[in-house]
Each structure stands twice: as C-alpha cells, then as structure tokens.
Amino acid sequence: MQYQLLINGVLVDGEGERQSVYNPATGEVILEIAEASPAQVDAAVQAADNAFAEWGQTTPKARAECLLKLADSIEQNALEFARLESQNCGKPLHCVINDEIPAIVDVFRFFAGAARCLSGLAAGEYLEGHTSMIRRDPIGVVASIAPWNYPLMMAAWKLAPALAAGNCVVIKPSEITPLTALKLAVLAKDIFPPGVLNVLFGRGQTVGDVLTGHEKVRMVSLTGSIATGEHILRHTAPAIKRTHMELGGKAPVIVFDDADLDAVAQGVRTFGFYNAGQDCTAACRIYAQRGIYDALVEKLGNAVSSLKMGAPEDESTELGPLSSLAHLKRVTAAVEEAKALSHIRVITGGSQTEGKGYYFAPTLLADAKQEDAIVQREVFGPVVSITVFDDEDQVLRWANDSRYGLASSVWTQDVGRAHRLSARLQYGCTWINTHFMLVSEMPHGGQKQSGYGKDMSLYGLEDYTLVRHIMVKH
C-alpha cells in the first residue's frame, strides 16, 4: 500500500520532510512518509472550507449514508486495519481484531443514527407576535488531532460526530502512528464528497501548528497531553477558536474492605494493563482500605506477574510494547524515580525487558504515598501504584487531590457508599465494581486538567454544533 495524504478528494504525496515510522515491537523502521507542506495544509483547509457550503446543508440522511458506508468499508477491511494498527502500535493483533475494530465500526454506525435524531427545540412564543426556534447547526472546518495510543479509534471518535453534524474535517494523526488513518483516507476518498474529509501527516510543530492556526479552522479537537493542550490553547487564543480537549488522566481505583478482591485483582490486571497501560482511563492509582490492603497487594502481585508479554502476532500475548523509544524512556524514568523512594516496594516488574522492542515489564508498586509523583502524575504505561487508606472521607479527599478528572472506579458491596462516592468524585466517569467500560451511547470526557467536551453519545454530537436562535415576527 502507498501511504498518501488526502486533500480535496485526491490522494497525494507529502511535499515536506520525510519521517520514519517504526514498529515498536522490533524497533525497526517500517517505512518513511513525507509530511504535508504548509501549502498542502492550506490546501486541505481551503478544500474543507469550500466543501462546507454544500456538506453543511446536506440532509442528516445523506450524511448518515456516508458514515454507514465508511463503517461497512472498515468492517470489510478489518484484518488489514488490525494488522496495520498492530504493526505500528505494537498492540496484540487479537486485541485489535476482537476489541478495537468492532468498537470503531460501532462508533460510525452510532453517529450515523444520531445524525438523524439531532434537532433544535421549538421554543414557542416568548414575545407577543413572535415565534422563537432553536437550531443546532454545524460549526465549519474542524481540525482534529488524534493521539498515538488508539490511532484509529480516536480518529473515529473525532470524525464520526464532526461529520455527522455537518462539519468538514482536516485530521492529523500522530506522526508516530499514522498508518491506519492514512488507510482510512483511501476508503474515505470514494465515499465523501471532495474536501469533506482531509487527512494529513506530520509533526505538531511542522503541520499541527499550521493547521490549528489556520484562519478558516473554526474548531480544534485534540486528544493528547496536558502540555499539548496548553500549547494549542495558547496558539489558537488570538482567533477565539472553539476547542474540544481530552488531555489524559490518573484514574483512582477505590477498593473498600467489603469488595470482591478476586474481581478487583482481575479487573486491575485487565483494565490497568490493556494496551500496555497507554490509556487515559487505565486503572493505575489504587487506594485499598487498610483491612484488605495486604491481601489485595498479594492478589494483585500474582495477577500482574502472570501477564504475558510477547510478539503482537502471538495469540497468547496480553501485553505489547510501548509505542516509541521516547515513551519507553519516560516510563522508565518515572518508575526509577518511584523506586528511589525508600518506602516504595516493587511487587513485580519495575524495569524494561531485554531484547528488541520497547517493552516494559508490567509493574506493581506498593506502599505509595499520596504526595508521591507516581500517584500524582500520569505515567501512561504498564505501571500501577497502590496506597492504603483508612476511611471514606480520607480516600475521597485523596482521590480528588489530582489535577486530572477523567475516570474513576469504586469497588464495594455497599450501594449507599457507591452512590455517595460517585456523587462526590470529581471525574467525568465513575464505574462501580468495574472499570474501563465504554459504549457509544454514553459520554466520555473529563474535567479539571483532563479537559472538556465529550466524545461519543449525543452529547458528543452536540459538541460539534452551534446553538442558534431564530425569531420570526408574525
């Protein structure tokens, strides 16, 4: 397959600097791709702006039909997408096939249906002789910046609602993991009118800044780090652009002494280490009540140490590599900083593995304190800390003592306690006796420095619209 940009309905080679794309399981170069030039970024935005005049006025049915065609096409090419995602990200192939591709297809299908249900409210007569109506209209050109942890899924989360609402999109995947987005461009070319969906490739400083700063971009949607979010907000502030930010998390997992510890251990084994822990909602910050602390540490140690690392194509592999050498170094530095603290116990893991690729052993760090960096900062790797707490008030205070506010979970058999905690936790989502469960019908998004705006659900669709008041005199 030839990897090209999609600009105004045409696949073209990039005209900028060539960048290497790596296989993180081996550390080897997969291929080189040329970035978009500033002129190509401008051409993509101009094409989107021109296409918006017609696409923004199409019927919801017409937009839905395009989204359904794209969903069908992804499903028909599922194995190729899965292989590309696995090769480029190091994900276990069976996880991409069984978990991610079906969810991606479902997102496009959900928003195809949601597009036909979005409407304004008939507000009625609030002034004598005048009738008011509320419209929800598309915004215009949306610049979408997708991350490297779930390249195709995050592209789907951004593209589906934006296009369903009638916007035109220019999307830039991460330069680390662009392959599935560029494959998606090949399919989209024959489904959407020229200019409605444009796909670029390049780094943030060479392509992203030009894209988000373009005068005709009306909205910027980012999934990335807090630092990247801050940069984009500063960069776009002079033009007062609308923004949609999902900027990471440090999910507290609150385990009370009446919890099912086997379920907790299995849950953390799965939900703390899926995708090598490179997930904003990962179950990575455990608070265990004193009465069950030692027992939970033992169970978690056994569970985490049993995770099988290996080649992505191996059916038995549960944990693949980290996405890049630079990220492996960041995770290693965070764990080494924690290990240097005298009170930290390394129950299992704690270092990168020998051999090829960017692998880091699944790690459990016990006896962490609330003020430790390993508790306060997002590591974004296969690393889980566990901290002891005494009572409900203390753990609520500690759980909320974070700059992040994306996801959390509470493990207890006490229904009243579950409701009390979920009402007071400062997180966009709180799961009870589970973690990491996402469905297209429900919103995903954070508060505090985890960002704002919702992905998925009707709330996600509304985020890509403008509320307008129409008043008719009669």
Swiss-Prot record:
Coiled coil: none annotated. Pfam families: Aldedh (PF00171). Its EC number is 1.2.1.19, 1.2.1.-. It catalyses: 4-aminobutanal + NAD(+) + H2O = 4-aminobutanoate + NADH + 2 H(+); 5-aminopentanal + NAD(+) + H2O = 5-aminopentanoate + NADH + 2 H(+). NAD(+) binds at A146, P147, W148, K172, P173, S174, E175, D209, S225, I226, A227, T228, C280. InterPro entries: Ald_DH/histidinol_DH, Ald_DH_C, Ald_DH_CS_GLU, Ald_DH_N, Aldehyde_DH_dom, Aminobutyraldehyde_DH, PatD. It comes from the Bacteria. The active site is at E246, C280 (nucleophile). Pathway: Amine and polyamine degradation; putrescine degradation; 4-aminobutanoate from 4-aminobutanal: step 1/1; Amino-acid degradation. SUPFAM superfamilies: ALDH-like. Keywords: NAD, Oxidoreductase. One of its GO terms (molecular function) is aminobutyraldehyde dehydrogenase (NAD+) activity. Belongs to the aldehyde dehydrogenase family. Gamma-aminobutyraldehyde dehydrogenase subfamily. Homotetramer. 4-aminobutanal can spontaneously cyclize to 1-pyrroline, and 5-aminopentanal to 1-piperideine. Catalyzes the oxidation 4-aminobutanal (gamma-aminobutyraldehyde) to 4-aminobutanoate (gamma-aminobutyrate or GABA). This is the second step in one of two pathways for putrescine degradation, where putrescine is converted into 4-aminobutanoate via 4-aminobutanal. Also functions as a 5-aminopentanal dehydrogenase in a a L-lysine degradation pathway to succinate that proceeds via cadaverine, glutarate and L-2-hydroxyglutarate. This is Gamma-aminobutyraldehyde dehydrogenase. It comes from Salmonella typhimurium (strain LT2 / SGSC1412 / ATCC 700720). The lineage of its organism: Bacteria, Pseudomonadati, Pseudomonadota, Gammaproteobacteria, Enterobacterales.
